[in-house]
């Protein structure tokens, strides 16, 4: 199961970069919301152990578990539909006692593993109609289950991930061109429909988020509140930032203008407290 590994071949630079990004993340989350910092530290420890274990695994044997991974995705997504813990109107987490599992997140990794095995198995017939239909059929169940949580953003992300995997797998340009010729107008038509009041394709809050993305000023006090304040926070950090855990009264974070800054908006904290230099280090 494990392979012989020479330390000289180990990518220590990559490991150091991963650790550095995790440390910055822990510091930023601790500054945003102290109560969740310990959970982030635990996640980093578990993640590093998992990374080292997987690094020494024989990947060819790991790929043999791809079907188990796919079934795990489907089963956990079904379970979260019936037994999931709800937050903000969406059931996305399974409470396992010692931690919460978000199946839609594990799905991203396990679907990559599954399709890597799938592409290897059918690489000689990859551009045939039968194989492409199989690939599409396998992605439909997880997409539907994720969408029903509801989780539109992850549904879109997994769809994009699937398209990237197909491209990397060697999808012919003729097929890509045909798909784009259909997909681009379809997306535009879909957006034109869901942006209308009274539409029933998506939920109202999902429509409002789309509208806020295209016209944040109109939704400055609702859906775009954190989005716009994040921009202000990043800009206020200037070159060197205001410092981690600062007590600056003019801070966007300290003024509670980013009430959920420890979530997807954590980069706003990095921008405000570490400035352009700190933000550039994270991005680069």
Q: Language-model segments: what does each one mean?
A:
Residues 1, 11, 127, 203, ...:
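General structural signal for secondary-structure boundaries
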Residues 1-18, 62:
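N-terminal membrane topogenic signal
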Residues 6-7, 131-132, 169, 255-258:
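Helix-boundary and loop/linker segments of multi-pass membrane transporters
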Residues 15-23, 27-228, 268-284:
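Hydrophobic alpha-helical transmembrane segments of multi-pass inner membrane proteins, especially
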Residues 224-245:
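Extracytosolic (periplasmic/ER-lumenal) interhelical loops and adjacent juxtamembrane/interface segments
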Residues 238-274:
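Long extracytoplasmic/lumenal interhelical loops at the membrane interface
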């Amino acid at each position: 199961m494990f392979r012989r590994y020479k330390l000289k071949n180990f990518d220590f630079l990559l490991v150091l970069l991963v650790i550095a990004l995790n440390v910055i993340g822990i510091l930023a989350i601790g500054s945003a919301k102290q109560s969740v910092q310990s959970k982030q530290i635990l996640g980093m420890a578990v993640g590093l152990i998992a990374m080292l274990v997987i690094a020494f695994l024989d990947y060819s044997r790991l790929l043999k578990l791809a079907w188990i991974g796919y079934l795990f995705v489907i089963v956990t997504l079904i379970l979260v539909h019936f037994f999931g813990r709800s937050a903000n109107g969406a059931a996305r987490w399974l409470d396992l006692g010692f931690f919460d599992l978000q199946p839609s997140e594990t799905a991203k990794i396990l679907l990559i593993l599954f399709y890597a095995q799938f592409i290897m198995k059918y690489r000689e017939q990859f551009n045939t109609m039968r194989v492409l239909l199989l690939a599409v059929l396998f992605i439909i169940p997880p997409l539907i289950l994720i969408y029903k949580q509801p989780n539109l953003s992850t549904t879109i992300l997994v769809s994009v991930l699937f398209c990237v995997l197909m491209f990397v797998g060697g999808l012919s340009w003729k097929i890509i061109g045909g798909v784009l010729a259909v997909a681009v107008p379809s997306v535009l038509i879909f957006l034109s429909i869901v942006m209308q009041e009274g539409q029933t394709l998506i939920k109202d809050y999902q429509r409002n988020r789309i509208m806020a993305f295209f016209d944040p000023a109109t939704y400055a006090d609702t859906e775009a509140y954190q989005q716009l304040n994040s921009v202000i926070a990043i800009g206020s950090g200037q070159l060197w930032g205001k410092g981690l855990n600062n007590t600056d009264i003019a801070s966007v974070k300290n003024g509670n203008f980013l009430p959920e800054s420890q979530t997807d908006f954590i980069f706003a904290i990095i921008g405000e407290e570490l400035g352009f230099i700190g933000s550039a280090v994270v991005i680069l």
